[in-house]
Swiss-Prot record:
Its EC number is 5.3.1.24. Disulfide bonds: none annotated. The lineage of its organism: Bacteria, Pseudomonadati, Pseudomonadota, Betaproteobacteria, Nitrosomonadales. Signal peptide: none annotated. The gene is trpF. This is N-(5'-phosphoribosyl)anthranilate isomerase. Gene3D superfamilies: Aldolase class I.
Length: 211
């Protein structure tokens, strides 16, 4: 099975094109103004217009107002919403676009119950827990905390980079990945060599799986 990859925290057209060139399935835009990787919806929209067909544009939000999601998703031309804060399942379902719900994984969190609560989500994004920080920390969580049978599709995130992605795939049997800081030279600035190395390792793991 092909592993789907989203490269998140894109702020520049050249980085989006590098991600696409190396096989990314989705591009993520941080539409939370407090983030160091924030991009305006207008600039995100200019990048989205350059994406080829079937590469999805994902907007990342943290506890937004409904009007902010509606306005920015339309301006940017998004395909998918990703909620990374404390948004309720009811709030996430209020929009005309499908959504992913991020969850910061830690000991004591019942992921099965969480998945049932957000049953309307397209999937769960599993990220590392760091107190007071919604995501993008570059930290890895204990992958053994992922249940064998989650009732929703899930995406592995949190501290992934070319040096650990092979282990991540081997240990979790994932089918989708979200990477941001692991392919950067600075916050919001991607490194084409790191993108290339990351994607090469992902595809090599696919080859091993299919052999």
């Amino acid at each position: 099975m092909r592993i789907r990859v989203k490269i998140c925290g894109i702020t520049r057209l050249e980085d989006a094109m590098a991600a696409v060139q190396h096989g990314a399935d989705a591009i993520g835009f941080i539409l939370w103004p407090q983030s160091e990787r924030y991009i305006s919806p207008e600039e995100a929209g200019r990048i989205v217009k350059c994406l080829p067909p079937f590469v999805r544009a994902v907007g990342v939000y943290v506890n937004p107002d409904k009007s902010w999601v509606e306005e920015t998703s339309a301006t940017a031309g998004l395909d998918l919403l990703q909620f990374h804060g404390d948004e309720s399942a009811d709030f996430c379902s209020r929009f005309h676009l499908p959504y992913i719900k991020a969850v910061r994984v830690r000991d004591g969190l019942d992921l099965l119950q969480y998945a049932q609560h957000y049953a309307g989500a397209r999937g769960l994004l599993l990220d590392a827990y760091t107190a007071g920080i919604p995501g993008g920390t570059g930290h890895v969580f204990d992958w053994k905390l992922i249940p064998a049978e989650l009732p929703l599709p899930w995406i592995l995130s949190g501290g992934l980079h070319p040096g650990n992605i092979t282990d991540a795939i081997g240990q979790t049997h994932l089918s989708a990945i979200d990477v941001s800081s692991g392919v950067e030279v600075a916050k919001g600035i991607k490194d084409v060599n790191k993108i290339s190395a990351f994607m090469q390792r992902v595809r090599s793991c696919e080859d091993v799986r299919s052999s």
